[in-house]
Design a protein with these regions (language model features):
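A generic structural signal for alpha-helix starts
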Residues: 44, 140-141, 206-207
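NAD(P)-dependent Rossmann-like dehydrogenase/reductase catalytic/cofactor-binding core
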Residues: 175-223
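A generic alpha-helix structural signal
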Residues: 50, 147-150, 216
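N-terminal Rossmann-like NAD(P) cofactor-binding subdomain of oxidoreductases
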Residues: 1-87, 190, 212-214, 222
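C-terminal substrate-binding/catalytic lobe of Rossmann-fold NAD(P)-dependent oxidoreductases
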Residues: 58-61, 66-196
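Hydrophobic alpha-helical scaffolding
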Residues: 39-40, 94-96, 202
Length: 223
């Protein structure tokens, strides 16, 4: 029978390990974890950024907005539904909705529980999304330091998972990109000295699929 199951969606169960490759996959225990979740595409985009910022600057609070392309859970034309916004035509509207990504981050970083929240805006784009992260941090910082911390991580512990670009690109340029998050360094901003904004692009299908493969390979090697 099946010995290991990797779920490609969030699971709201504290007994199930929320595993984001490159961030906390070292927590996997072959004798304990037979079912794990790879969280979601957006969680995989946010988690590496949270790791870098929290490890180096300590996050006090944060708000996350994902500007997300449409998915097959939406409708082409308006239709009756209990979810009034998701029932509207997906290709002609910007649609505010919920995201479980911030909640999943809290499972990965319990010390941030109640300190991060967010929502999604579904936009009429076929593929590639953008996550906007705003953090209040304990340590004073600057735009240059934030970008340097992210760049350093992208070359070391988070190589091939987190990337940084200085190019003036748009969403379609990240179609079929294998990284979980590609930070747009030109959009990084710091206000005051401890309020920062980081924007990261991601292919919510292909990037996430690559991490699923990374997880499967890791489980195979360990098991």
């Amino acid at each position: 029978g099946v010995k290991k199951v990797i779920v490609s969606a969030p699971i709201d169960d504290p007994k199930i390990l929320n595993l984001v490759y490159g961030v906390n996959h070292h927590l996997y225990n072959k004798d304990e974890h037979n079912i794990i979740t790879a969280a979601s595409c957006t969680t995989n985009c946010i988690a590496p950024i949270v790791k870098v910022i929290h490890d180096n600057l300590k996050i006090n609070h944060g708000s996350i907005t994902t500007i997300h392309n449409i998915t097959n859970s939406q409708t082409i034309i308006d239709k009756p539904s209990s979810d009034l916004r998701r029932s509207r035509a997906s290709m002609t509207n910007l649609i505010p909705t919920t995201t479980g990504s911030a909640k999943a981050i809290n499972l990965i970083y319990p010390e941030l529980k109640g300190k991060l929240n967010g929502h999604a805006i579904r936009v009429p784009v076929i593929n590639a999304s953008l996550t906007d992260c705003v953090f209040e941090v304990k340590q004073n910082t600057s735009k240059e330091e934030v970008n340097e911390l992210l760049k350093e991580a992208s070359k070391n512990k988070l190589k091939n998972i987190l990337e940084v670009t200085h190019e003036k690109l748009v969403s379609i340029d990240f179609n079929h990109h294998p990284a979980s998050a590609i930070v747009d360094a030109s959009l990084t901003n710091v206000v005051g000295s401890n309020m920062g904004k980081i924007s990261a692009w991601y292919d919510n299908e292909w990037g996430f699929s690559n991490r699923m493969c990374d997880i499967a390979e890791t489980l195979h090697k360990i098991s």
